[in-house]
């Protein structure tokens, strides 16, 4: 008897996790379709490595077409097969041993298919090629991060980012803000999805939308403290230098996923630096630094290797530090170069003006950093970014000296919140209090709707931001004894950054470490 999976009652991620041994990659190029197995992501050379074979008979029931919302099966299937389809307009050739390298910039889109009410196949958004975002669909279940957020554009849900990144214990809970780029209202409602797709217990305290009405000739941005700013005349730096070595400013001129990775060779510096020079207009007392950035997957990997050193004592360590004061946690993170520090130069001295919280590795965020220049007379304007080795990626940098325009901000509380079991969980999300929405399992999810402002916009445009707070805790089952002597060295400032750099050079000098990043051991 055929078994059908109703995704109205069973979250797609839950189904995917249940059948993870059957994850199945199919490559579509100009010439043919091919099964990929033993798939490895090489983030540093920006390519996918795999072996190839003919597509199995259980995966030939339909031929997917990029761009369509859904496709019908030609016949009934049994257990759902989670398929990941890679599309490229360029031919991809395997070598004599059926090994293939696929550059990420050759991938036009990724589409994931799963059973939908037993007879349809659901399309998950195609992803722009040439970016590390391509990896999202592949590594989602291997990373250590936070709740995933998807926004509805009126038709489908798009991945937007992660809630409260880096808040790994209750005392680290904080407000977090980011733009929902794809969110559109339908029937006067905004709808988002928040899901647990990782080995974590996630505690979401509150969700709130900030609907911002601003002038047509401006872009609305938000700083990490939740203040809205407008951007009108951004300018790029005319000079950038990584570890005092000049680089091409064009690298950070556009939102093109051609990023600074903070991995320059250095013999002296404890942390990596990127120095910027901007032309400074006359008599400007304020500037808004505009950054498009994210944390690196390498930082995730480094944390994973660090936590593994605790062995079977990790859960005891996590429990012991659950109530560690926030100030102590923040001090350690700053000493290890985990936040991205923003410094400004004045009279040959650098002064710290902001430390940016983690934003997660899966999606770039647009962040604005307001900087007061009243006591700064330097020309040109010099700014420095500083962090640990390969902890951040910065795609675009600009400065805007314009005054903030007047904006109208509508705070929208949740109107409806229904979890994966059909339960009403609205009360857990409306206020920042001690009532949390707890998502302990992979596949737990909630659909949250907000009533949009009913007033008609006569001029200007809307931008919507998500305000959120909460924390999460890892679920790990490491084995072996803790390496106590080595772990004690991580109390020293800079040790975690040095650990990252050491691992990286070991990683690129041999294949053993690369194999540890194998995404799926896909059954042939």
Predicted regions: what is each one?
Residues 39, 374-376, 388:
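Hydrophobic loop/turn residues within beta-sheet-rich immunoglobulin-like superfamily modules
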């Amino acid at each position: 008897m055929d078994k059908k999976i109703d995704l109205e009652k069973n979250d797609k991620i839950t189904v995917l996790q249940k059948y993870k041994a059957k994850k199945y990659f199919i490559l579509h190029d100009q010439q043919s379709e091919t099964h990929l197995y033993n798939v490895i992501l090489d983030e540093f050379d920006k390519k996918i490595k795999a072996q190839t074979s003919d597509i199995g008979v259980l995966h030939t029931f339909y031929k997917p077409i990029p761009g369509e919302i859904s496709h019908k099966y030609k016949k009934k299937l049994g257990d759902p097969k989670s398929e990941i389809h890679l599309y490229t307009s360029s031919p991809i050739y395997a070598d004599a041993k059926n090994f293939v390298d696929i550059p990420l910039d050759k991938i036009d889109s990724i589409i994931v298919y799963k059973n939908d009410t037993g007879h349809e196949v659901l399309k998950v958004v195609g992803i722009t090629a040439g970016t590390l975002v391509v990896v999202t669909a592949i590594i989602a279940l291997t990373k250590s991060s936070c709740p995933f957020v998807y926004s509805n554009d009126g038709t489908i849900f798009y991945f937007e980012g992660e809630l409260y990144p880096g808040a790994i214990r209750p005392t680290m809970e904080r407000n977090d803000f980011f733009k929902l780029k794809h969110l559109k209202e339908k029937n006067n409602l905004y709808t988002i999805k928040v899901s647990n797709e990782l080995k974590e217990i996630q505690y979401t305290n509150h969700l709130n939308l900030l609907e911002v009405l601003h002038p047509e000739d401006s872009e609305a941005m938000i700083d990490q403290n939740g203040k809205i700013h407008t951007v009108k005349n951004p300018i790029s730096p005319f000079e950038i230098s990584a570890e005092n070595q000049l680089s091409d400013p064009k690298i950070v001129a556009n939102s093109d996923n051609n990023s600074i990775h903070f991995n320059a060779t250095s013999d002296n510096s404890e942390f990596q630096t990127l120095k910027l020079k901007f032309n400074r207009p006359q008599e400007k007392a304020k500037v808004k630094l505009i950054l498009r950035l994210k944390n690196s997957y390498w930082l995730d990997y480094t944390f994973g290797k660090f936590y593994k050193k605790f062995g079977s004592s990790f859960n005891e360590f996590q429990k012991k530090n659950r109530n560690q004061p926030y100030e102590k946690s923040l001090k350690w993170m700053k000493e290890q170069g985990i936040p991205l520090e923003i410094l400004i130069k004045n009279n040959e001295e650098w002064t710290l003006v902001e430390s940016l919280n983690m934003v997660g590795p899966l999606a770039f965020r647009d962040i604005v950093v307001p900087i007061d220049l009243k006591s700064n007379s330097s020309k040109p304007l010099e700014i420095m970014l500083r962090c640990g080795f390969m902890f951040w990626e910065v795609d675009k940098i600009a400065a805007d000296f314009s005054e903030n325009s007047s904006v109208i901000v509508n705070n929208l509380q949740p109107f409806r919140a229904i979890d994966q079991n059909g339960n009403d969980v609205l009360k857990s999300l409306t206020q920042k209090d001690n009532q949390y929405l707890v998502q302990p399992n992979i596949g737990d999810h909630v659909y949250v709707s907000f009533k949009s402002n009913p007033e008609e916009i006569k001029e200007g445009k809307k931008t919507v931001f998500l305000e959120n707070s909460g924390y999460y805790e890892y679920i790990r089952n490491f084995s072996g004894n803790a390496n106590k002597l080595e772990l004690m060295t991580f109390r020293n400032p800079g040790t975690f950054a040095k650990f990252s750099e050491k691992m990286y050079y070991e990683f690129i000098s041999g294949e053993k470490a690369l194999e540890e990043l194998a995404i799926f051991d896909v059954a042939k």
